[in-house]
Amino acid sequence: MTDPSAHSAALTYGSYLALDELLAAQRPRSEEHDELLFIVVHQVYELWFKQVVHELTWLQERLHRGEGGHALATLKRVLTILKTVVAQVDVIETMTPRQFTAFRSRLEAASGFQSAQFRVLEAMLGRRDDRMLAPYPPDGPGYARIAAAMAAPSLFDSLLRYLATQGFETPVVPEPRPAGWRQPSEAVQRVLLEVYRADGEAALVCERFVDLDEGVQEWRYRHVKMVERTIGDKPGTGGSAGARYLRSTLFTPAFPDLWAVRGAL
């Protein structure tokens, strides 16, 4: 005879995806119809950020091993996810300023500025700024993850390591890095010129890095325009500067050398 308890414990679609917990994680703080959409969209963003960080960690491992083909496949996946993240802005923009204002006060100090996963992503892209740690308690997981990401090699550091495995003489990156985003380096650009002139797999990997940088910048632009059309120049929730801060993040490349070298190709 079949054991009934064994049947009840069998893996199902719902249990594998933890759907009971997942679908119970939306807890609106008002009776406003549109608040659920706001929560769902932002939770989906966090899931995508988790996947992007997961993929970029894998990407760095492949680059360190000199596996250009696997790196290209992983970058393609990340770029496709970023397109999905950007397209999601269309959904949140179906909410009018009046609809958002109806429940905005219920957010209290909660703000997207506090997204630890996005700060980890920024650190992986190369941002080195202790101000990113300010919103998080020092003994909390968010603080630890961001600090660890800032202490680890950035994606561009990993790209340089990959280029070294392909026979290119890459300059040593000084540690600790200056605060902020990576600054252009003529020594790095000379190496990149060699890479592009060789026109091999390494050049393709560099081009996908340009796509990654562009994809993140596209997300930033769509995000700031969404905030502007929803709350204008009002301060963000939690006392953040809102659209004004977001505008300050536009057009700052994560990989400036890959952009600077293009004029010499």
Swiss-Prot record:
EC number from the UniProt entry: 1.13.11.11
Q: Which reaction does it catalyse?
A: L-tryptophan + O2 = N-formyl-L-kynurenine
- Protein's GO biological process: L-tryptophan catabolic process to acetyl-CoA; L-tryptophan catabolic process to kynurenine
- Name what cofactor the protein needs: heme
Membrane-spanning residues? none
Against HAMAP family, the record matches this protein to: T23O
Its name, as the record gives it, is: Tryptophan 2,3-dioxygenase
Record carries keyword Cytoplasm: no
Gene that codes for this? kynA
Q: Which family does it belong to?
A: Belongs to the tryptophan 2,3-dioxygenase family.
Which Pfam families does this chain map to?
Trp_dioxygenase
Which enzyme type, at the first EC level?
Answer: oxidoreductase
Gene3D superfamilies recorded for this chain?
1.20.58.480
So where does heme get bound? H223
InterPro entries hit by this protein:
Trp/Indoleamine_2_3_dOase-like, Trp_2_3_dOase
Spell out the molecular function terms from Gene Ontology.
heme binding; metal ion binding; tryptophan 2,3-dioxygenase activity
Q: What is its quaternary makeup?
A: Homotetramer.
For this chain's record, the cofactor binding note is: Binds 1 heme group per subunit.
Which source organism? Answer: Anaeromyxobacter dehalogenans (strain 2CP-C)
Q: Which residues bind substrate?
A: F38, I39, V40, V41, H42, R104, T237
Query: Which UniProt keywords are present, listed alphabetically?
Result: Dioxygenase, Heme, Iron, Metal-binding, Oxidoreductase, Tryptophan catabolism
The family database entries (SUPFAM superfamilies) matched by this protein are listed as: Indolic compounds 2,3-dioxygenase-like
Q: In which pathway does it act?
A: Amino-acid degradation; L-tryptophan degradation via kynurenine pathway; L-kynurenine from L-tryptophan: step 1/2
Job of this protein: Heme-dependent dioxygenase that catalyzes the oxidative cleavage of the L-tryptophan (L-Trp) pyrrole ring and converts L-tryptophan to N-formyl-L-kynurenine. Catalyzes the oxidative cleavage of the indole moiety.
